[in-house]
Every structure is written in C-alpha cells, then in structure tokens.
Amino acid sequence: MKAVRVHILGSGGREHAIGWAFAKQGYEVHFYPGNAGTKRDGTNHPYEGEKTLKAIPEEDIVIPGSEEFLVEGVSNWRSNVFGPVKEVARLEGSKVYAKRFMKKYGIRTARFEVAETPEELREKIKKFSPPYVIKADGLARGKGVLILDSKEETIEKGSKLIIGELIKGVKGPVVIDEFLAGNELSAMAVVNGRNFVILPFVRDYKRLMDGDRGPNTGGMGSWGPVEIPSDTIKKIEELFDKTLWGVEKEGYAYRGFLYLGLMLHDGDPYILEYNVRLGDPETEVIVTLNPEGFVNAVLEGYRGGKMEPVEPRGFAVDVVLAARGYPDAPEKGKEITLPEEGLIFFAGVAEKDGKLVTNGGRVLHCMGTGETKEEARRKAYELAEKVHFEGKTYRRDIAL
C-alpha cells in the first residue's frame, strides 16, 4: 500500500469510481459514508461533518465527491482537502454569485437579470423573449432550472420559486437568463491555482427515456472520449483561464475540480453554470478511460506539481440502471443479482440481510470499454442485461 491514504466523501457512483481508480493504483481508500459497493474497494465510515474531517491524518488526502460538502466548508476545516473553500464553492452554491462573477470578469455567459421578489420578476421578464429561462439561486438537486414558453406561466412558477412554494427547501432570488440555442457540452479540469489540465470530454444523457424524452435526471449514461475541434478547445481553455484569474482577483486560490457547463452557440462556448466538483455519470467514464492518468493528475494537482494530460485509452460507455419511479419516487428495497464478471460502479445500493438491495434512484453504472465506441457500447449493454432487479429502468440509446 502507498503511504498516503485517500478519503472520499459521498455515496454515489462518482465516489465509487474515484475510489476504484485509487485502489487500482495501490492506495488505501476510505469512504464517508460510501455504499454497499464501495467497501469492495475500501472501507466505509459514517460521516459526521467537521468531527470526521478532524480525525483524518494531515498527511492523507480528502476528496469530496459532491458539492454539498464543499458548500458546507470542508476545505475551510482542513488543508488536506482537494476542493475549493466555501467562499469559492459559491460559484456552484449560488447562481446569482456565479453570474455576477462572470459579468465582473468578462467571462462569456448568457445575458441575465436577477429578481429578488415576484414584483421584480414581473418587471424584469419584459427584457426577455421566449423561451424564458429561470434559475434558482441555491442548490436544488438538478430541479432548479425552468424553461418555459409562456410569460404568465414563467411569472407564476418563478414567483413560487422565489417565495419557496415550488421546490421543497428552495427559496430566494432567481436568475433570468437569455435562452441560448446550440449544443451543450461539459468540460472538467483538475486545477491548482492558475494551472489546470482538462480531462477527456464526455457526453452525458440527462433525460430519463430514449430520444431525450421524459423528465430530467442526474444522468442516465455517458460515453467518451468525445472529439472536440481544437479551436473550440482553445476557447474553452480561455474560459477556464479567465475563471481562475477571477478567483485569484477575489483573493483565493482554486484547488480541486472545476466543471464548466457550456453551450456552444454560434461557434463560441458560453458558460451556463459552474460546478466545483466532477460530474456524475461523466466521472465513471473518465476514470475508466485511464485510471492511472486520472490518479496522477489529481495527486499532482493536490501537491501543486506538473499535471500531465489524461490521455484516453480507447473508449468507455456508462449505462445507468435506475429504479422504477426515478427521478420522483424511486422504489427501494428490491433485491439485486449481479454477474460475476464486469466493471460496475455502485450508487443507490444497500445491503440487507446479506443481500444487495436498491436504495436510491440511480442504482448501478454498467461500464464497457473497447478500442471502438461500438465495442465499448456492446459490452456495457451486455453487462446491463445480466443485472437483475425488479423495476430495472435504463436507456437503450446511450452512445448511439
């Protein structure tokens, strides 16, 4: 085992994938709280906030998987956390802060207004034409964006969002964004200060059903690497550079992962949103493409060393198996049977009486790899078909 231990905060497929990559390179891995699958690659522990962080040795590295930990301030509690401090995590934690940050530092984003009351919303919506885009200020677990054609419906739902009657636990100001047509793209990087290395580009599928139909989800699958023209990559690098320059001007140094949610509009990438952590299910594909390269990039980013590009080896496809009722009311407690072979990252899985059972919306990530996208896709779907639980739901068009 390597001298440095790795402590991963979270319980989803993304966290399992990160831990798997480190375990594969010989690191001792600990998960907080983890799930029924993560303990195959490390040790699970309860997560008790600051108390948990204080007990982790200073020489070890802590990697928060999801944004809640960073917004909570885990990087403020300890210096061995690979993630930005909570003041910088506001880039994800507050859409209003993020949009004002982009405007302040001349970073390309959609034209916007902020409305703090229903009356302001009614007045400011007049500056926009349909479709109307309304975004909740705070974290809303992927449910905080409304895209509507009717001005009256936008005012009605946007007002409910402001006063806390639309989404449970979400209230406060909203961002009105100009609608941008184009192709969405995610760009993720490992960052230390002004230095960064962009990870392989991955396409994910947000809608529940084939053909991009049905409700939005956390993501039903992904594949990579996606080929991006070099001139577009150069423009994306400029967006990362300007963002990190802005963070520095605000008096902070960025260390951790940075994710740009982009829209390619008229040949230029615009930032729709920032995330201060890796995407899920994109992470599962990135680490599978080159686990060793991913681990090295993270460790060099953590230490402030020279980060090398993570070169993809072949192709990888992730097919997500979800529970019936996802995303609104996923069924839990259904027994799972798994094949003996194949790479599967666990998400909403628990152990009950020695058996694996469903315990969340997205249950498992079935991975396929190959020299071609078609080979990787075939393997991922062959694996998905060998997994059994009542109500298994998945898309058939990932990586087509």
Curated annotation (Swiss-Prot):
Domain ATP-grasp: 99-303
Originating organism: Thermotoga maritima (strain ATCC 43589 / DSM 3109 / JCM 10099 / NBRC 100826 / MSB8)
Phylogenetic placement of the source organism: Bacteria, Thermotogati, Thermotogota, Thermotogae, Thermotogales
PANTHER family: PHOSPHORIBOSYLAMINE--GLYCINE LIGASE, PHOSPHORIBOSYLAMINE--GLYCINE LIGASE, CHLOROPLASTIC
NCBIfam families attached to this UniProt entry: purD (TIGR00877)
SMART domains named in the record: GARS_A, GARS_C
Pathway the protein takes part in: Purine metabolism; IMP biosynthesis via de novo pathway; N(1)-(5-phospho-D-ribosyl)glycinamide from 5-phospho-alpha-D-ribose 1-diphosphate: step 2/2
Cofactor section: Mg(2+); Mn(2+)
Residues the entry annotates as binding Mg(2+): 273, 275
A GO term for molecular function: phosphoribosylamine-glycine ligase activity
Protein EC: 6.3.4.13
Catalysed reactions, as listed in the record: 5-phospho-beta-D-ribosylamine + glycine + ATP = N(1)-(5-phospho-beta-D-ribosyl)glycinamide + ADP + phosphate + H(+)
Residues at which ATP binds: 125-186
The protein's name in its UniProt record: Phosphoribosylamine--glycine ligase
Entry-linked SUPFAM superfamilies: Glutathione synthetase ATP-binding domain-like, PreATP-grasp domain, Rudiment single hybrid motif
Stated family: Belongs to the GARS family.
Cofactor note (record): Binds 1 Mg(2+) or Mn(2+) ion per subunit.
UniProt record, GO biological process: 'de novo' IMP biosynthetic process; purine nucleobase biosynthetic process
Annotated Pfam families: GARS_A, GARS_C, GARS_N
